[in-house]
């Protein structure tokens, strides 16, 4: 019996009904490149491999890796031993379908890491802490809207698929969970701006949520820049839409 490791944020999915709902939402097909992050004890791995001839999986826990290697031969399950936060998903090709019950202690940095591979991804289906999903899909001028919302909404269409109670896991987490689908936007839907500068602008704007843009963006923007862009410097970061941050980035790049 594998004992869940707190340092890995392990909560294993044990509800078959939830498992099948997730796999049906993914609808995996032979010939697709499907990658599972954190397969754990194989709750998703098993039904995925019932529908697929081959699956990639990224796993850090050596005990789990050994268990999975005993369960499936490498021609069915290719295991990539290591930290998903450092893994080069681009090494697996294009048109990737990425899935997983993500460890809650690394879910936000992992979503930021996956952003850089958006052009190579077809879609992603993740089980996450409900609070994180609320932030991902949040609208401007709400408490949940922030850096994560903007960075993901710029690159992905997102759909909240279902809620998952703590009882679906062993051990039960202290929080509610949810399943979300992310589909990369087409090139035409994503205005071309300097990605590093965009990330810098958004991070600066939200570094101190209670302060106005006049203060948070003072290192990047002058008073006349706000006038030129038609943006009120007395607003807070959460008042601006993704398109506003794209406009700021494009303006700063040409100033």
UniProtKB/Swiss-Prot annotation:
Alphabetized PROSITE patterns for the sequence: RRNA_A_DIMETH, SAM_RNA_A_N6_MT
Domain of life: Bacteria
Pfam short name (any one): RrnaAD
Stored InterPro entries: KsgA/Erm, rRNA_Ade_diMease-like_C, rRNA_Ade_Mease_Trfase_CS, rRNA_Ade_methylase_Trfase_N, rRNA_adenine_dimethylase, SAM-dependent_MTases_sf
Enzyme's top EC category: transferase
UniProt function note: Specifically dimethylates two adjacent adenosines (A1518 and A1519) in the loop of a conserved hairpin near the 3'-end of 16S rRNA in the 30S particle. May play a critical role in biogenesis of 30S subunits.
Name of the protein in its database record: Ribosomal RNA small subunit methyltransferase A
Organism for this UniProt entry: Thiobacillus denitrificans (strain ATCC 25259 / T1)
């Amino acid at each position: 019996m594998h004992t869940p490791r707190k340092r890995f944020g392990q909560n294993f999915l044990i509800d078959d009904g939830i498992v099948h709902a997730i796999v049906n939402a993914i609808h995996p097909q032979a010939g697709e490149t499907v990658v599972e992050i954190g397969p754990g004890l194989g709750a998703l791995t098993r039904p995925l491999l019932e529908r697929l001839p081959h699956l990639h999986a990224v796993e850090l826990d050596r005990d789990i890796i050994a268990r999975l290697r005993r369960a499936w031969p490498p021609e069915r399950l290719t295991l990539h031993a290591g930290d998903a936060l450092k893994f080069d998903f681009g090494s697996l090709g294009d048109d990737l379908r990425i899935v997983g019950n993500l460890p809650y202690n690394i879910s936000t940095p992992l979503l930021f890491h996956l952003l850089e591979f958006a052009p190579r991804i077809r879609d992603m289906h993740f089980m996450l802490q409900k609070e994180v999903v609320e932030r991902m899909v949040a609208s401007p001028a709400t408490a949940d809207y922030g850096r994560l919302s903007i960075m993901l909404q710029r690159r992905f269409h997102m759909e909240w698929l279902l809620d998952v109670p703590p009882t679906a896991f062993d051990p039960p987490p202290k929080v509610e969970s949810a399943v979300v689908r992310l589909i990369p936007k087409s090139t035409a839907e994503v205005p071309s701006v300097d990605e590093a500068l965009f990330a810098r602008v958004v991070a600066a704007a939200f570094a101190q949520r209670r302060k106005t843009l006049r203060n948070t963006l003072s290192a990047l923007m002058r008073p006349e820049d706000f006038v030129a862009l038609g943006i009120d410097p007395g607003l807070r970061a959460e008042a601006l839409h993704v398109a506003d941050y794209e406009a700021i980035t494009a303006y700063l790049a040409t100033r």
